[in-house]
Every structure is written in structure tokens, then in C-alpha cells.
């Protein structure tokens, strides 16, 4: 019985660890995305990155972040295709995950 409990505890710990890595990776991705977008928008990188990170708490998934960028690009007259924004989001998530793994 102890073996089953140990395995269950190990699975719970792995799940918690994986969720923490996912959260950290998404937050890092949003920061990197904010820096990228700020460069295109002519805004302060750190301040805008914070806005992007905060925008991600509006709803689950990436749509809130995408909408923030799309709205801000449109308002500033910056031409970036939806596909390019989504591709950058995917690319920066991979980069962020690699950075987080490297730090762990």
C-alpha cells in the first residue's frame, strides 16, 4: 500500500511541478512578447511587457494577449498580420520554456 501512496504522491508532485513550469513559461513568454511589441510600438519595453503580462489574466488561453497586441498595433497604425503575432507567440513560448528549463 505504501508503494501506491508513494507513486500517487510522486505523480501529484510532478503535476504541480509541470503546472508551475507552464505558468512561468507563459509569464516569461508574455514578457518577451511585450518587449518585442514595445519595440514596434515605440513604447517603454518593461512597462509595456507588464501590460501584456497583466492582460493574460483576463481569461484562460492566449486570446486575451492576442487581442491586446492586435488592438494596440491597430491603434498605433503598426502593420503586423495576425499570423505573425500568433507565430511570434508560439516562437517566444518555446524560447521562454527553454530559458525556464535552463534556470531550473
Label the predicted regions.
Residues 1-104:
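A charge-rich, low-complexity, intrinsically flexible signal that marks solvent-exposed coils, linkers
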Amino acid at each position: 500500500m505504501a508503494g501506491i501512496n508513494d507513486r500517487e504522491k510522486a505523480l501529484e508532485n510532478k503535476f504541480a511541478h509541470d503546472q508551475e513550469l507552464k505558468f512561468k513559461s507563459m509569464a516569461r513568454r508574455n514578457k518577451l512578447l511585450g518587449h518585442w511589441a514595445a519595440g514596434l510600438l515605440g513604447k517603454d519595453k518593461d512597462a509595456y511587457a507588464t501590460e501584456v503580462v497583466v492582460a493574460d489574466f483576463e481569461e484562460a488561453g492566449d486570446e486575451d494577449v492576442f487581442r491586446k497586441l492586435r488592438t494596440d498595433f491597430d491603434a498605433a497604425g503598426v502593420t503586423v498580420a495576425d499570423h505573425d503575432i500568433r507565430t511570434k507567440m508560439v516562437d517566444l513560448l518555446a524560447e521562454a520554456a527553454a530559458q525556464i528549463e535552463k534556470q531550473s
